[in-house]
């Protein structure tokens, strides 16, 4: 059976739907109100509120296919068989419903009777004390020698506190060809990833509660959480050497091949040629990273210097370095993005509408990175010349200039230099820990006993820009309390601070401190500020020196704070305007605020019109012009309810004695811990830059504030309009004026009349005007193409007929860059008029020698060709289509068939 990725996914969803599971749509890659995650990285990540009982699930049985992103060890992508950044997780879940027996039965039934896998090739791991699971697998006649009992380290999920339980893993034996060294079974038993025994499914039984001291009690409500990576399952079903040799990846790699001088060979997996492996890895990196880039940008995460934005930038830069290694023509970019969207749009329907946006963002970032690469190389060459190359400088190439680690190592090796890579690796590890901590901001490692026990009081001042403070807590990067850190990374807590910590969807303040206890008044910048479990602000630094009781001066970046406050207050006004102007049932389901912009996510069963968005926008402008002062009210939960304050998490807020309410007149009243403007006039202006679907009835609005930000945005958008206008003029110049004279004149006049918007309020009309013109020009382009194709078909037909000779059995011809479909149709027409002849046609299309044979008993012709040339392809007795790997000319064919 031909198992495509789409078919594997749909089979999974259909199977569990028949078993009374509710099918959930894939959620956004960006976690909703979950600062513990930078990205959604598992199928269960979007369901945590159901498992924790914070929310009631829509059904006790759930199933999904969830898009995920993991970038914690990005350097491995492309060099291993199954490591990817973007992947899909298939999952079935039970929340207080079925348990071990049914979960195992479902897995066995689906794998054997639907995916048609051989149960004799199953290898199973179970927790050593879990006899129920062991016996259930035995009941399914799994060979006892294929079931291994493992200890807690392998088959027991436990975070140290809270729900936990055993798990069972299903592996599939792919055969000896994936185990040439005969060590696969040894690796499997030692829990080491290998290509023969591939894990395809993991079932976690949430059965116990850990009180934090290693005491386990049975849970009243037991749950099932399972996960199966779709790419792993597809590679098994397609018998592919690696995940990168499955259907979707191979489509992308085919596009890459068409634009570079190298070829990708799935069979190179079996050759163990180091140079070939390295070459093939670049294909994989490009395909994988462009998938991730397409999905992340389609969800509004643009390349940038911080957090999620930096991940996208790094992925793109790493992909571009691989492009350079393959001497890749960057014209492939639009093609590969089109193919990614085409491969996934049936299930991830939001992608199609973001096609042009993804392309524009990628191309803009490429132009910027090309300049950055040059600057980085100048810095590198200068340091080599001056003999000042250090681990710190090579680290700077990665952090500041975006050079992937493997490229940095190659640059150093090419110069025959040596540096202390241990120091470099330590700096890289510290840098990665920033992302790691951003992933863990929810209660900042709530389970860590050192942080839980740290209860020294610290005060945050909302309305001060600078403050003198004392160091009251120091922790290394592993959260171990220390008395001193010297030029190291770690976390520092002050008795008072003015730096806002990431929370409530608002990013931490940019800021720094001057440590007066150091002889040189060392300035130390902070790469993150996070709330600990006892609400203190932990300031993360990459390199710095502190001792307990050091005296410092703390300050935040006032411009950053002002813009972030603008956008946070703007988000409150936007939320209120959506409720009052559109639908009172709209409720924010996620938000993000920084100095650059604000976003709000909400549920609604329909698309908002442009008029509705502008109505909301104009209402906010009115509130800005009214110069409404903000009011900060401290009260308890009951008091906040009397004020009708909006609270996103009532069960959480109700546990706090004192709450902070931010009020803008009678229009907006919300519980909030973020920074805000004193008066709406500070916001200056607003503009909605984007509105799009996140799927499943969820929508996102992106909005910006301040005159400077909006003016810069208008300039950037005008550059896009200028570029589009230039592209449209080029299209018009290629249309045949002798045929479409009237249409060309009318379209050119419209294009000449187009004027760039001078005000932000004119931007949408200008964009709509040019897009409408683009649509009309493309329609004319299509007409022109059809006419040109008709003319080309007529020309080809005349050429073929001129070659027909009643004394010859074969008509042999060659063409350049003719669309295969057009050539085949024309060839059929000519053959129908000359059915005693055999037509052998070479077409040099997309840098390959495609070949068509139409005639009588083509199998005899093809057999003769195969004996003489390296020919690939297939067909029947009347038609053959394929390609030559050799340089085959009409002269050689005439000689072979004695067509004289």
Swiss-Prot record:
Q: Which residues bind Zn(2+)?
A: 568, 572, 672, 676
Kindly list the cysteine pairs connected by disulfide bridges: none
Swiss-Prot/TrEMBL catalytic activity: tRNA(Ala) + L-alanine + ATP = L-alanyl-tRNA(Ala) + AMP + diphosphate
- Chief subcellular site? cytoplasm
Q: Where is it located?
A: Cytoplasm
Q: EC number(s) in its UniProt entry?
A: 6.1.1.7
What cofactors are annotated for this protein?
Zn(2+)
The answer, when asked if Ribosomal protein is one of the entry's keywords, is no
Query: What domain of life?
Result: Bacteria
Keyword vocabulary terms for this entry = Aminoacyl-tRNA synthetase, ATP-binding, Cytoplasm, Ligase, Metal-binding, Nucleotide-binding, Protein biosynthesis, RNA-binding, tRNA-binding, Zinc
Concerning Gene3D superfamilies, the annotation shows: 2.40.30.130, Bira Bifunctional Protein, Domain 2 (3.30.930.10), Threonyl-trna Synthetase, Chain A, domain 2 (3.30.980.10)
Q: Name one GO biological process term.
A: alanyl-tRNA aminoacylation
Q: How is the cofactor bound?
A: Binds 1 zinc ion per subunit.
Functionally, this protein is described as follows:
Catalyzes the attachment of alanine to tRNA(Ala) in a two-step reaction: alanine is first activated by ATP to form Ala-AMP and then transferred to the acceptor end of tRNA(Ala). Also edits incorrectly charged Ser-tRNA(Ala) and Gly-tRNA(Ala) via its editing domain.
HAMAP family, per database record: Ala_tRNA_synth_B (MF_00036_B)
Q: Tell what the record comments on domains.
A: Consists of three domains; the N-terminal catalytic domain, the editing domain and the C-terminal C-Ala domain. The editing domain removes incorrectly charged amino acids, while the C-Ala domain, along with tRNA(Ala), serves as a bridge to cooperatively bring together the editing and aminoacylation centers thus stimulating deacylation of misacylated tRNAs.
NCBIfam families (alphabetical): alaS (TIGR00344)
Q: What is the protein's given name?
A: Alanine--tRNA ligase
């Amino acid at each position: 059976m031909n198992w495509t990725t789409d078919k594997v996914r749909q089979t999974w969803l259909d199977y569990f739907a028949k078993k009374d599971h509710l099918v959930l749509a894939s959620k956004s890659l960006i976690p909703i109100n979950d600062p513990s995650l930078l990205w959604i990285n598992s199928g269960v990540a979007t369901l945590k509120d159901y498992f924790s009982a914070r929310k009631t699930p829509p059904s006790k049985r759930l199933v999904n296919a969830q898009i995920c992103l993991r970038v914690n060890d990005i350097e491995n992508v492309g060099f291993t068989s199954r490591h990817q950044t973007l992947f899909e997780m298939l999952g079935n879940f039970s929340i207080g419903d079925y348990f071990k027996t049914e979960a195992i039965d479902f897995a066995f039934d689906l794998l054997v009777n639907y995916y048609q896998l051989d149960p004799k090739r199953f290898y199973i791991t179970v927790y050593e004390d879990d006899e129920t699971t062991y016996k259930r697998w035995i009941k399914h006649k799994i060979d006892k020698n294929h079931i291994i009992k493992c200890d807690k380290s392998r088959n027991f999920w436990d975070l140290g506190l809270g729900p936990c339980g055993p798990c069972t893993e299903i592996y599939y034996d792919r055969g000896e060809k994936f185990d040439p060294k005969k060590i696969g079974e040894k690796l499997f038993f030692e829990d080491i990833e290998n290509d023969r025994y591939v894990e395809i499914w993991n079932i976690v039984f949430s059965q116990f509660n850990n009180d934090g001291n290693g005491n386990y009690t049975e849970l009243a409500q037991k749950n099932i959480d399972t996960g199966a990576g779709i790419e792993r399952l597809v590679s098994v079903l397609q018998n592919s050497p690696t995940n990168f040799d499955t259907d979707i990846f191979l489509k992308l790699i085919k596009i890459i091949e068409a634009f570079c001088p190298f070829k990708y060979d799935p069979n190179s997996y079996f050759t163990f040629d180091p140079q070939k492996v390295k070459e093939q890895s670049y294909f994989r990196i490009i395909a994988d990273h462009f998938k991730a880039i397409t999905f992340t940008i389609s969800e509004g995460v643009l390349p940038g210097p911080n957090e999620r934005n930096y991940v996208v930038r790094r992925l793109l830069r790493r992909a571009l370095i691989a492009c350079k290694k393959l001497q890749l023509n960057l014209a492939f970019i639009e093609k590969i993005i089109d193919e990614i969207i085409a491969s996934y749009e049936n299930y991830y329907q939001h992608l199609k509408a973001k096609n042009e946006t993804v392309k524009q963002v990628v191309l803009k970032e490429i132009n910027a990175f090309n300049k950055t690469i040059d600057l980085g190389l100048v810095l590198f060459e200068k340091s080599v010349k001056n003999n000042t190359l250090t681990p710190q400088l090579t680290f700077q190439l990665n952090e500041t200039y975006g050079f992937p680690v493997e490229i940095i190592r190659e640059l150093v090796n090419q110069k025959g230099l040596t540096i202390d890579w241990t120091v470099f690796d330590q700096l890289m590890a510290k840098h990665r820990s920033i992302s790691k901590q951003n992933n863990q901001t929810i209660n900042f490692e709530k389970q860590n006993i050192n942080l839980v026990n740290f209860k020294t009081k610290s005060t945050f001042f909302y309305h001060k820009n600078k403050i003198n403070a004392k160091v009251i807590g120091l922790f290394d990067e592993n959260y171990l309390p220390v008395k001193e850190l010297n030029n190291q990374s770690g976390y520092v807590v002050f008795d008072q601070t003015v730096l806002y910590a990431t929370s409530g969807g608002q990013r931490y303040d940019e800021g720094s401190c001057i440590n007066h206890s150091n002889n040189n008044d060392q300035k130390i910048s902070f790469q993150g500020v996070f709330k600990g479990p006892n609400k203190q602000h932990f300031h993360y630094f990459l390199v710095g020196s502190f001792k307990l009781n050091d005296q410092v001066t703390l300050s935040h970046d006032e411009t950053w704070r002002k813009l972030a406050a603008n956008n946070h207050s703007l988000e409150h006004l936007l939320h209120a305007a959506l409720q009052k102007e559109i639908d009172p049932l709209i409720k924010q389901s996620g938000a993000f605020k920084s100095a650059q912009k604000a976003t709000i996510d909400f549920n609604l069963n329909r698309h908002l019109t442009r008029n509705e968005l502008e109505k909301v926008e104009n209402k906010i402008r009115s509130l800005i012009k009214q110069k409404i002062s903000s009011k900060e009210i401290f009260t308890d939960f009951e008091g906040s309810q009397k004020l009708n304050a909006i609270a996103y998490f009532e069960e959480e807020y109700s546990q706090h004695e004192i709450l902070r309410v931010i009020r803008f007149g009678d229009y907006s009243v919300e519980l909030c811990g973020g920074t805000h403007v004193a008066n709406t006039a500070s916001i200056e202006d607003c503009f909605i830059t984007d509105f799009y679907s996140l799927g499943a009835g969820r929508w996102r609005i992106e909005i910006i504030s301040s005159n400077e930000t909006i003016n810069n945005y208008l300039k950037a958008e005008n550059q896009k309009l200028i570029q589009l206008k230039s592209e449209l003029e080029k299209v018009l110049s290629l249309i045949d004026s002798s045929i479409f004279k009237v249409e060309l004149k009318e379209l050119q006049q419209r294009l000449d009349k187009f004027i760039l918007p001078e005000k932000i309020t004119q931007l949408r009309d200008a964009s709509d005007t040019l897009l409408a013109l683009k649509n009309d020009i493309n329609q004319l382009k299509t007409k022109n193409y059809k006419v040109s194709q008709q003319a080309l078909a007529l020309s080809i037909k005349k050429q073929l007929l001129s070659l027909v000779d009643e004394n010859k059995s074969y008509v042999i011809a060659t063409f350049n860059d003719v669309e295969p479909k057009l050539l085949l149709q024309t060839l059929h027409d000519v053959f129908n008029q000359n059915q005693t002849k055999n037509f052998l046609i070479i077409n040099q299309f997309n840098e390959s020698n495609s070949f068509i044979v139409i005639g009588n008993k083509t199998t005899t012709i093809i057999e003769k060709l195969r004996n003489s040339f390296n020919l690939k392809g297939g067909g029947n007795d009347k038609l053959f289509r394929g390609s030559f790997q050799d340089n085959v000319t009409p002269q050689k064919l005439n000689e072979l068939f004695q067509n004289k």
